[in-house]
Amino acid sequence: MLSPVVHDAVLTPYGRQQCVEFAQANPDFQNIPELIIASPFRRTLSTTLLAVPKTFERLSPQGVILMPQLQETHDFPCDTGSDRDVLEQIEEFKDRGFDWSVLTDDWNKNEGFYAPTPEALADRAKWVRRFVRDRPETNILLIGHGGIFREIDGRMRGPNSGVTVSLSRWGNVECRVYTFQNDDDENATMIPIQEPSLIHAIDKPIDSHVEIEVVA
């Protein structure tokens, strides 16, 4: 399980295995995304390389964006990213074409825009939704974390208890497909799409080190 005291926690061996299994179970899916947007945490960078390796190879470097705004929603050490100079020297990520320039000095300070407050999280989630909606691509793959995905979804605090339960946790390497309600909504509201035939979930116990979501 994810220990809150481990800084920028990495994937467990089991989590890495599940990523590989996802890639093997979904060969056709690798051809769908036109853009990858990933949280710059170590575990999400590993997920990107292991779960969608062919997609990464096809799109990198221009089609792979690191997005600090996709980081997790708490200030625990495990949910705090590493400094740019640390990430650049990690063997797994070196020479893979990641553009680290987006990692400003404050990206992992959990303050201001990145503070773990309800107001800041709502603003950050809206920022992500609007960024994605304004992109020219149709099929965009977000690789991030359950906490920020719940904020991006926006229905967690709604009256529907079934939705709340569904959003309470993402399964390991689980994909959820969304579209936008319209093109000019100030909030960039997203609505879920069910496409079970497109994406096969890995039916295994949840390990919170692995999160993946699709936004279409």
Language-model regions, residue ranges each:
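Active-site-proximal alpha-helix that buttresses catalytic centers in soluble enzyme cores
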Residues: 1-62, 66, 118
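Acidic, low-complexity terminal tails and accessory targeting/binding regions
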Residues: 3, 72-93, 150-216
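Short glycine/proline- and acidic residue-enriched helix-loop micro-motifs
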Residues: 5, 96-116
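Glycine-rich phosphate-binding loop signature in dinucleotide/nucleotide-binding domains
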Residues: 28-32, 132-139
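Beta-strand elements within well-structured catalytic alpha/beta cores of enzymes
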Residues: 37, 138-148, 152
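A short, structured active-site edge motif that brings together acidic residues
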Residues: 40, 59-78, 103-111
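Catalytic metal-binding/acid-base residues of hydrolase active sites
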Residues: 42, 70, 147-149
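A short, acidic, amphipathic alpha-helical segment used as a generic capping/interface helix at domain edges
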Residues: 121-137
